[in-house]
């Protein structure tokens, strides 16, 4: 699948190619039409605003003028989407929590690019003109409002049906993770639907869109409630600097929007006794180690660190994710070398665990079937 940037580049290339073809076809008309067309000043009977949504571009070459005309139309839609995005702010803020898994985030730029790419499929080069005195090129790009509006209505209808399907599945399922995943998917579809609705407002001369069946803010609140009531993550760490690493991991998971329990697994509650509140569904457990290396370096001391973690479904004891990392840090003193190793270990472990766990919870990644090699076993052999 092409990225947004690749799709944009391909579309611009097509516009430029169209400009060249258009210019070859209409070249004689350029030199016969010395007076500038009325659309250069923003109004035209031939391309009336009631029927066409247009943008004008000018440049030293015809292809560049056509590309700028296309960009002028694009800016109209992007500006409207950004103006309307405050209505989706609650979910976009939820998506921005943490920094570990940006590849799965739904961002305003992604929403803007996807919806604008769709609507701009209807844009074509309408007219061109070359100033015979200055040699400057002008281009008019635009879309037929009726045709583009019909395409937007169809896409909005598709997304409304997808939202309803996702919500029905989320409410009917007995599986807690499925409830979270389908509700989040419904929200992503709803945000994209509202972006298309913003496009429709631009296309229609009335400025009216289609009323949504659900509000983004309401479903975002539901998602947070479902997460809090159906999912709890426990963290259990053993080894060197275990308490510090455990706190860092818990803080990192909270930043991801994941509900984390402060109870130590197996320590606070007797075996077989149920805790108050939701049951523990996922457990992050692992071991961390740090030790000094014997390196013949008169200036620096070196400390090695390693970590081996698994993410386990508590009910089935099935491993759904694993993270093994290791590294070496140096400094002039042993204390500073160990301190630096501890800081780096926390940063890397938290980042990987947050990304792995969030990917599993939200259904963005397939659970690992084979655990990676033990970083601590490898490190101890090397050290």
Spans of model-derived segments:
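Bacterial N-terminal signal peptides
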Residues: 13-25
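Intrinsically disordered, low-complexity charged/polar segments
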Residues: 35-46, 75-142, 363-376
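A structural "domain/chain start" motif
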Residues: 53-56, 143-144, 152-157, 164-256, ...
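Short secondary-structure boundary motifs at beta->alpha junctions and helix caps
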Residues: 48-64, 166, 172-174, 313-360
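Bacterial N-terminal signal peptides that target proteins for export
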Residues: 2-16
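N-terminal segment of the mature soluble domain
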Residues: 70-91, 230-285, 315-319
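Surface-exposed short loop/turn segments
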Residues: 91-126, 266-319
């Amino acid at each position: 699948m092409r990225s947004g940037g690749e799709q944009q580049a391909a579309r611009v290339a097509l516009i430029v190619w169209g400009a060249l073809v258009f210019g070859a076809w209409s070249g004689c008309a350029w030199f016969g039409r010395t007076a500038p067309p009325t659309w250069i000043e923003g109004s035209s009977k031939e391309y009336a605003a009631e029927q066409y949504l247009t943008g004008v571009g000018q440049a030293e070459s015809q292809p560049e003028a056509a590309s700028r005309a296309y960009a002028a139309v694009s800016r109209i839609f992007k500006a409207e989407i950004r103006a309307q995005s405050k209505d989706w702010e609650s979910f976009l803020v939820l998506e921005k929590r943490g920094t570990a898994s940006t590849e799965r985030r739904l961002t305003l730029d992604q929403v803007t690019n996807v919806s604008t790419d769709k609507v701009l499929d209807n844009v074509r080069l309408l007219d061109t003109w070359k100033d015979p005195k200055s040699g400057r090129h002008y281009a008019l790009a635009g879309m037929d409002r009726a045709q583009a509006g019909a395409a937007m209505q169809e896409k909005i209808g598709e997304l409304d049906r997808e939202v309803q399907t996702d919500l029905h599945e989320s409410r009917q399922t007995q599986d807690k993770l499925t409830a979270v995943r389908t509700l989040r998917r419904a929200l992503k579809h709803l945000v994209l639907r509202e972006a298309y609705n913003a496009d429709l407002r631009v296309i229609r001369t009335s400025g009216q869109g289609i009323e949504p069946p659900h509000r983004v803010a309401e479903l975002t609140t539901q998602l947070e409630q479902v997460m809090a009531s159906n999912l709890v993550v426990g963290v259990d760490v053993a080894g060197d600097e275990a308490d510090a690493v455990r706190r860092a991991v818990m803080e990192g998971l909270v930043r991801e929007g994941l509900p984390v329990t402060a109870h130590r697994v197996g320590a606070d509650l007797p075996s077989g006794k149920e805790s108050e509140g939701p049951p523990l569904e996922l457990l992050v457990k692992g071991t961390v180690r740090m030790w000094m290396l014997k390196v013949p370096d008169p200036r620096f001391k070196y400390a090695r660190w390693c970590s081996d973690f698994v993410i386990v479904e508590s009910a089935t004891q099935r491993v759904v994710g694993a993270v093994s990392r290791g590294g070496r840090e140096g400094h002039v003193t042993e204390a500073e070398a160990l301190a630096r190793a501890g800081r780096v270990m926390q940063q890397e472990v938290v980042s990987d665990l947050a990304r792995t766990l969030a990917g599993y919870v939200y259904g963005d990644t397939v659970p690992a079937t084979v655990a990676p090699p033990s970083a601590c076993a490898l490190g101890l052999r090397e050290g």
